[in-house]
Amino acid sequence: MSSSPALPSRSTWPAWLLLVLAAVAGLGWWWSAGRPVNLPDAPSTRIACVSYAPYRLSGETPFDPHAFISPARIDEDLRALSQRFDCVRTYSQGQGLSAVPAIAQRYGMKVLMGIWLDRDARANAREIAQGIANARAHPQALRGVIVGNEVLLRGELSPKALTADIRQVRAAIPASVPVSYADVWENWLRYPHMAAAVDYLTIHILPYWEDAPVSPEHAVRHVARVYAQMQRAFPGKRVMIGETGWPSEGRPRRAAVPSVVNEARYLREFLAYAATVKMPYNVIEAFDQPWKRSQEGTVGGYWGIFDAHAKPKFPMRGPVTEVPRWWLGWLAAAAGGLLFALLAGWRRGARGWLAAALAGVAAGAALAWQARQMMYACTNGWDWSISIAACVLALGVALRLARAIAAGLDRDEFATVPWQGWRFTWLFALALYGLLQVFDGRYRDFPLGLFALPCIGYAVLALLQRAMPMPSLEQRFLAVAAPLLGVVIVVQECGQNVAAWLWLGLCLAIAVPVFAEWRRVRRLQP
């Protein structure tokens, strides 16, 4: 009894259709990313206050105990920021940041000076002492002193201990300098007695990070509702928004999609709203902070109005383009089409050459998008090595699949399935990454460009198969697991995350043919 029964001839138009759709989708993805998007203008190009952390260059991180930012570097940053901002917010006194008030004063800027608190009592004492000395030395430069940032959210201090630290600072600095504590708005409602210890409330409203993430289209309305709620909850207390903003890169959360366009949309609309209610606010943040990726994934590093090289990411007026050099994606697609036509369509007829070229266009566009994602996501040599190796492997498998597809379409006959073991490998990778997304997906990107190559390639080939070996039990198990995990991810995202739906689509593209083969083999076996 044969385990690889042959099937009669069938139409090849579904395979052609899928190839064309894949190529058009790849080109269309890049084209849409390069279209200017019209947005409402900001009421002004100046912003009241912005979070300032100088750790923007490669290798810089506040977790380095020996890190020190020179006064010259801070001077350079604040001189540039003074052209756009009236105030900067800092978070710590250490690593050279105690110099900020004196330097900001030179440029006519105010400072929301931070004192960093955590569970280290000795470090807290040093921060508090330095903060008190700074406030006494430069009271005229300060818009306020913020004692602690989200320390209750992190669970590193009790409300009682935090209150004692706040009152210590309040008693030691000039009365003209107001004192506050900053945390997510929900924690102020959870610990309302903390309001008695501060001169005003500093609340963080980050629509992207809410437990129920808010889309950019509704984000400012959400901020307005929360701000009004906090004013009602704490009558007689001034309420300041200490952090608000939107990320430009990273993992979507439900309908909250990080992008340059969405960051520009949010900030412009927020500034317009803030102008109507005349509230104090601070936006996060001045510069992208690549070091945050180690804690919060890709998305953590890209909340800046300026990139890590101090270049503005978008204008505050006029159209905004997501990927200005979008044509590089088309160039990669053209290179992929030429490469595949030469290597996979070699010695084929016109139809085989065209099929290989279409596969190459789709592969080139997908790999270019994956490369762009890697540029933002990879934090070290290990990340780069693993990512590049995965892309090379995906390209090799895609090229081999394209050869089989070109052979099948060129002769109008069924193709054999190459590298069955590699299909198992990619199914395993999909299932494994799906598990990570389900149980630890908060900060994980969707590597759609990487997995598009094998998933779509095997889907096209399934429409052209001739020899059909029985898929192994392991393949069948993974072909169930990967889509089921994809469904769970979609449900976790409440059906609002387009990236999650695309991930599920890729899982189905490679998994469904496994069961189609299994059914056909069982049907044809005596």
Task: List each language-model region with its residue ranges.
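Boundary/entry segment of secreted carbohydrate-active catalytic domains
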Residues: 28-80, 84
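Conserved, mostly hydrophobic/aromatic
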Residues: 50, 88, 145, 201, ...
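Substrate-binding cleft of extracellular glycoside hydrolase catalytic domains
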Residues: 64, 100-178
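Aromatic- and acid-rich polysaccharide-binding/catalytic face
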Residues: 107, 113, 143, 149, ...
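Aromatic-lined carbohydrate-recognition surfaces of secreted/lumenal glycan-active proteins
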Residues: 115, 169-189, 237-243, 279-289
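Glycoside hydrolase catalytic-domain groove-lining segments
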Residues: 209-250, 420, 444-449, 469-472
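Substrate-binding cleft of secreted/luminal carbohydrate-active enzymes
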Residues: 247, 255-317
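Alpha-helical transmembrane segments of integral membrane proteins
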Residues: 347-526
